[in-house]
A protein has these predicted regions:
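Histidine-centered catalytic micro-motifs
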Residues: 85-93, 167-176
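Active-site region of the double-stranded beta-helix
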Residues: 65, 92, 97-98, 107-118, ...
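Double-stranded beta-helix
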Residues: 112-175
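A short beta-loop-beta micro-motif enriched in histidine and acidic residues
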Residues: 91-102, 153-154, 160
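Non-heme Fe(II)-dependent double-stranded beta-helix
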Residues: 2-88, 93-97, 133
Length: 177
């Protein structure tokens, strides 16, 4: 219900703002949200969810006991009937850090199967280089698949039931269709 309430705010705007990234075919009459940016500012539920013991326990097992949660995050939407692909990228390009012990965690708010554009990951790429995310000298937030030596047909979809959690290293190459 919380996510539905936040998404309903899209019917009041014509273009993306500091809270919502809209799909290209969005209209006020037919709201289409691609992403809720900084969801912890939209509703307390998101901050509480990311700090739940069931989440932090899993992250602590992977990283050790002294984890820090980064304020912010986002809620990526893959709504039925529409939903833009996310180009191949590494999260590291968006927020580089001074150490390599950084993970991205996702909690599925709905069931995710092959029909609704799951996250696709390239196993083992977190051990490789950080790829270029520029086009014509400007940061574009995506890799050029033709310029890297990766076989994207080997991508693995991350599917699961609502409430499932995905965790990946921020250097792992990933995207969605």
């Amino acid at each position: 219900q919380v996510t539905d309430d936040v998404v309903a705010r899209a019917s009041e705007i014509n273009k993306s703002n500091e809270l919502l990234d809209l799909e290209p075919d969005h209209t006020k009459a037919s709201p289409r949200v691609r992403r809720i940016k900084r969801p912890h500012l939209a509703h307390e539920f998101y901050r509480r969810l990311s700090a739940e013991t069931c989440v932090t326990d899993i992250l602590s097992e992977l990283l050790g006991p002294n984890i820090r949660l980064r304020a912010g995050g986002k809620v990526n939407m893959k709504s039925a009937g529409f939903g833009s692909p996310v180009e191949w990228h590494q999260d590291w390009a968006f927020y580089p850090h001074t150490n390599d012990d950084v993970l991205a965690a996702g909690i599925l708010l709905d069931d995710m199967d092959l029909d609704n554009g799951p996250l696709l990951v390239m196993p083992g790429t977190h051990r490789g280089p950080v790829y270029d995310h520029h086009s014509n000298g400007a940061f574009c937030g995506a890799m050029d698949p033709a310029s890297v030596d990766l076989d994207f047909s080997k991508a693995v979809p991350l599917t699961g039931k609502a409430g499932s959690m995905t965790v990946h290293h921020v250097r792992l190459v990933h995207g969605s269709e």
